[in-house]
Amino acid sequence: MEYIKNIKEDYIVDNEKVKAAELDYESAVETLKSEYSAYYPQVTITIGNEWEDDRTPAKGTHPANTITHDSKQGIKKSITITQMIWDAGRTSSVIDKAKSTAQQAYYRLELAKEDVVMEAINAWLNLQKAHNTHEANKKVEANAKITLAMTIEKVKKGEGSKLEQLQIEQQYRTYQTLSMTSRLGLDSAIQRFQNVWRFFPHNIGNMPAPIADILGLIPHQGTEVTNNTTLRIARMDVEIARDQLRFSDAEFKPRIDGKLSYTEKDGELSGGYDTDDAQKVEFRADVTVTWKIFGGFKNRHLQNSDRAKLNAAHNRYDDVQRTTDEQFKNAWNNYVLVEKNLETLKRTVEINNEMYQLTLADFKAGNSPIMSVFGMKTAHIMSEVAYKNAQIDLQIARYQLHKLLGLVNPIIQ
């Protein structure tokens, strides 16, 4: 079971899909943190060399002083503190949307982990199934080859028929082809296993199978699928769309901002004559109400767009819920069917073994042809592999129930 432990210890941690999902979640969390900055004062410092054209009439009567200054130039320095006082819920809706987005990113991370766990387990079990099938075909092929050789000798001695020889050879060629086909299936399963687990499987026949409770206790029929991870992701799409619509609604309302500023104006910007070394200082404290009355219907169209997105998210959620519920019911029925079929397959193995022994005894007594012995031995071998693979199918079906319920929680530490 040492390799099975790698599901948590190595495979999930090192998997690229999980790493990417972790970074997406980290990005969403950082975005959420950035949205809170709207609640804090915004501090701005500006320094500039400015020119002004001032055509203000002077109070003096001298003809040369009819204009105070034709032009002004100087250094202007300021520091401004701006604080949002009230924005009709714009900021809170943006933060709530960022929260929902971060939560959805976390669910996507969980889904990535679920997928890689299921990928790892299925690669392991499908490798065992492919190995079982190939070994069974090899056994039948080997038996057919031995039987064919025996029949050829009997035909040479005049003790057997050519028809029986051809029938045996037909079976041999058939299972020779099946062995090559199952070899391709096994090679594909090995490649898949190696790609998933990052090591080459040796001695496949003695590899341990994952324990039945590796993902937890078996769920019950009728269990709600509300914890399905894909469904939870769809639910967050609804929340994100709802928060965006709240923001669009708030755009029709005014906002209130406060501003404190300190400004220094040097040189001619300070005002008056001969002011090269002069300086003017300004302090301002403003409270501003901003209300966009008309913007070319842009906000109205955006609001309609966001409302449509919310309705679409609701429809997608309902569709995912129905689909997931259907998948769980089908998976449960499949699990029950495979479980019931195990008893039938087990009994079939026993029957075929008994019939093979009886046919072999008849053959030794000269009452049955060798073709009958080969046929019963083949039936026994194939029923054995069918029973073995059905046991694996039962495990796969059970793990699929956990996946659909969002309960992929390996108990190994």
Residue map of PLM features:
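Short, charged, amphipathic alpha-helical segments
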Residues: E22, D96-K99, K162-R173, N304, ...
